Amino acid sequence: MVSKPLYYLFIVLLLTCYGQTISQNNEGDKIFGFTLSPLIPIDYFGAGPLILENNYSNIELSSKIGYQFGMLMRNTKSKNITLESGILFCRRNFKFIGENNFIGSSNSDVGDFGYINYAFPLNALVFIQLSDNVHMNTSLGAELDFYASAVASKSSQNFIHHYSERARWINGSVNASIGLEFRDKDVGVFYIGSQVNIPISTILVTHFKYYYAGSGGDFDDYEGAFLRGNYFNIQLKYFLPLSMENTKN
């Protein structure tokens, strides 16, 4: 986890970049579009499954496939460079599996939960033209993330009680992507690519109680586990044709 000074510096720099981008929105061609992406958890950078142990039980906490969708805007700065921003709805999903080894009582249980955030990405895209209609691009950028309130859930047999609280209400993350897009002046832009997203700091602090003697009986109280929420996604995007945007204007 990054130090507090670096965290605040990153947030301030990202807000400044957003302000500059908004102030320059009248420069260059703009197109608007939509995106839909599955979020695939990755085990790198400290985001792998967590094995939690207590006196009479243990719990494995890991990520599941989530999803993301939203609206995007591209602002062309030159033939090969474009800025892309937008607003996204993001849902990360997690699962937990628990077992107990209490004498005279043995049980296992499973459960899951989801966590929502709203993201404001800002990415710089560099294009390489492969043919008249096909372009490859790579991008690097950052994202401003706003997190929802705490979430709670219970396992399928009520042995495990879960509670997750947000580590902070605002956070930042780093994005990098590569992809291909097909452009048609009358139909629009179709894009498929992949992206990795790495939050700069913990997004969730997760707590468990395992009722190893049965629901409502004695329980193991787990210390908070810190979740990073890194993910890899397959990006699908569609942008309206520039001619349609010019007609609206």
Where are these regions (language model features)?
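Bacterial N-terminal signal peptides
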Residues: 8-17
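Short glycine/proline- and aromatic-enriched beta-strand/turn motifs that initiate or cap beta-hairpins
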Residues: 21-74, 237-244, 249
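Residues that define the transmembrane beta-barrel architecture of outer-membrane proteins
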Residues: 28-30, 63-67, 114-120, 134, ...
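Gram-negative (and chloroplast) outer-membrane scaffold detector with strong preference
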Residues: 74-153, 184, 233-236, 240
